[in-house]
Amino acid sequence: MDLSIKSPLAFLDFTTQNFDPHGDIHMLAVSKHATIMAARLGLSAAEIEWIEVGAKYHDIGKLFIPESIRRFPGLFTPVEQLVMQQHCQIGAQMLQLLGLPAPVVAIALNHQENYDGSGYPSALRGRNIPIGARIVRIVDSFDAVTHDRGYRHACSKKRALEKLHERSTHYDPDLLDLFETLIHETWDAVPGK
């Protein structure tokens, strides 16, 4: 790893571990599975590293969302939803200010974009969404539904995969197929059967 980005990453690690220990677990899980997907796709070592880092810090902008919204135990009002959606731009700006590479910044900015163009912040569609963000979109969704939230209980891995397929237009179909293959290959190693 480039030494010029090690200090900013150490800062981000310290910040997330002390600010939101449960979020840190999510970030590590998303990073691990996104990295496995990137490697399976045969991406370059640099691309894999960017995806590993971008996946880990994809939600870093949530640190600047009011706690009353971040930890709200129910569904958001339209205004709360708009505030929460700002985490993508805030996170991207933060990573950019810390000097992280553009592909890492792009993951934070675009990880809520949907393959069908219905996502945010820019309503990108298809392959206009960077590959790292398309990978993180899938892995993040899976990890989110396999863990308890204030407004719902965790799903089994089987049910989580069904949920991804119910919203399949949100995800790159080739990457979704790869993810499902990888989950089945590593079924016993993934928490929350």
Regions found by a protein language model. Give the residues of each.
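Histidine- and acidic-residue-rich, metal-dependent catalytic cores
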Residues: 2-193
